């Protein structure tokens, strides 16, 4: 990953990212305080506080190691799971527990949770390592993330009327051995990891990934780097924009543009780092890089190449996306740029889709950045059944948004479905989490394309 700070903003460079949120630590903590603490707060505030037993119950029900295939009849039963829970760490201020870190034994990962039970509490989780709050370097940007979450909890304590009381009423008995919670997926697209953010459907149409799946072999290795100077990596800016141009030209159920500068014929989907098609794609990627001002090539073999976000924006305009803009990441904006209506045949508007480009810094080091391609969406829904002494007392449906990401890291680089709403990009297919969520941004208006007026070179 290549990085630097610049007046024009984030430098986005290709890299193989470390997928662990925090370091593995071994230092000991003092004994945990009473998780509810001594307090003079109102009973409303006390009622939404989460106990350690409830935190563990959430981890057992929603933990990342749980898969649909691992339980009979595709159901997850909180009462039946025997997860190897280890140390439970506490982040405490003024004798009030604000955050929990529930660790699995043998450093097999952890789950970070808010201590408020008035909304979905899981903040982040990892499938490796161990989290102890006292071991986090205060200079690490991730400490700022934790402080931000702690401030959010304190704000909810001070304003209990903001709590989602319906959510609390549904989930207040989790961790009570007399109650059982079951989850059953109801979406058409399978999900191996279940969690939800809301209890209503947005009604958004599913967008099936096309280019993101077709170009799963594209990466910054081997023949894809053939035309990069100094035998450096071709760079994620060129790779991501290349996927976008392929999407414009080849995407089914999209407005298929006549893309000639550079041209990405059908063989581009066959390209790998080891075949001749990969070399042909590399030539087109070099043309893209040459269209991006101030493209920073790696100085020696294997070095990553990079570009600033504002320069990538200028390059997009040169390549035909003349109305392209750069905006902070917002899911609604993202979806509106992926799915829209267009005149394709005759006077009737048709539903079409196009992939988008997302860029962000890494939470562990915001000076490092990446840009990637996103072209799929679906709304995950599942039914939750609450039982008392194994007798059903209530059932409801919850929902979450999922996005299909192609990171440009090759077939084993984590391409697939991720939750759109987490503080990190959480895979729902067993891939490690991706922590590219520092000041994320979207390149918008990519639906508008005009073939460049200059000749191919």
Language model features with spans:
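Bacterial Sec-dependent N-terminal signal peptides
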Residues: 1-5, 19-45
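Sec-dependent N-terminal signal peptides
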Residues: 7-17
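Noncatalytic regulatory segments and standalone regulatory/sensor domains
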Residues: 37-63, 89-103, 109-188, 404-411, ...
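Structured segments of extracytoplasmic/periplasmic soluble domains
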Residues: 61-65, 116, 239-251, 318-319
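Active-site-adjacent substructure of cysteine-protease-like catalytic cores
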Residues: 88-108, 325-400
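Active-site-adjacent structural segments surrounding the nucleophilic cysteine of cysteine proteases
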Residues: 130-304
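Surface-exposed intrinsically disordered loops and tails
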Residues: 223-227, 266-273, 341-344, 383-397, ...
């Amino acid at each position: 990953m290549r990085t630097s700070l610049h007046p024009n903003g984030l430098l986005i460079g290709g890299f193989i990212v470390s997928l662990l949120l925090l370091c593995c630590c071994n230092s000991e903590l003092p004994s945990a305080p009473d998780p509810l603490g001594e307090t003079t707060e109102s009973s409303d505030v006390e009622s939404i506080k989460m106990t350690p037993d409830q935190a563990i119950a959430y981890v057992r029900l929603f933990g990342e190691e749980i898969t649909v295939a691992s339980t009979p009849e595709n159901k997850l039963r909180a009462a039946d799971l025997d997860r190897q829970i280890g140390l439970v760490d506490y982040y405490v201020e003024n004798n009030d527990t604000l955050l929990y870190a529930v660790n699995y034994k043998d450093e097999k990962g952890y789950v970070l949770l808010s201590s408020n039970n008035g909304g979905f509490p899981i903040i982040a989780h990892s499938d490796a390592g161990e989290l102890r709050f006292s071991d986090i370097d205060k200079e690490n940007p991730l400490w700022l993330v934790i402080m931000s979450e702690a401030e959010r909890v304190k704000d909810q304590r001070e304003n209990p009327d903001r709590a989602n009381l319906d959510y609390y009423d549904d989930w207040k008995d989790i961790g009570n051995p007399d109650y059982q919670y079951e989850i059953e997926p109801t979406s058409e697209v399978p999900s191996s990891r279940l969690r939800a953010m809301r209890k209503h459907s947005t009604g958004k149409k599913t967008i099936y990934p096309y280019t993101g799946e077709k170009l799963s072999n594209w990466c910054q290795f081997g023949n894809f780097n053939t035309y990069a100077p100094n035998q450096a990596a071709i760079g994620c800016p060129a790779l991501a924009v290349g996927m976008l141009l392929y999407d414009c030209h080849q995407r089914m159920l999209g407005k298929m543009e006549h893309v000639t500068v550079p041209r990405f014929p059908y063989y581009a989907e066959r390209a790998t780092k080891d075949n001749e098609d990969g070399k042909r794609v590399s030539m087109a990627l070099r043309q893209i890089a040459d269209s991006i001002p101030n493209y920073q090539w790696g100085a020696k073999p294997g070095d990553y190449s990079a570009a600033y976000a504002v320069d990538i924006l200028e390059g997009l305009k040169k390549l035909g996306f003349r109305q392209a803009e750069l905006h902070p990441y917002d899911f609604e904006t993202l979806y509106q740029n992926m799915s829209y209506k267009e005149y394709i045949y005759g006077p009737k508007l048709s539903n079409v889709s196009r992939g988008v480009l997302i860029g962000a810094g890494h939470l562990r080091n915001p000076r490092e950045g990446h840009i990637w391609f996103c072209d799929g969406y679906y709304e995950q829904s599942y039914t939750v059944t609450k039982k008392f002494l194994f007798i059903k007392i209530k059932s409801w449906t919850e929902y979450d948004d999922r996005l299909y990401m192609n990171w440009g890291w090759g077939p084993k680089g984590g391409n697939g479905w991720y939750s759109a709403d987490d503080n990190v990009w959480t895979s729902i297919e067993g891939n490690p989490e991706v922590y590219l969520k520092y000041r994320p941004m979207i390149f918008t208006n990519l639906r508008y394309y005009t073939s460049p007026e200059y000749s191919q070179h």
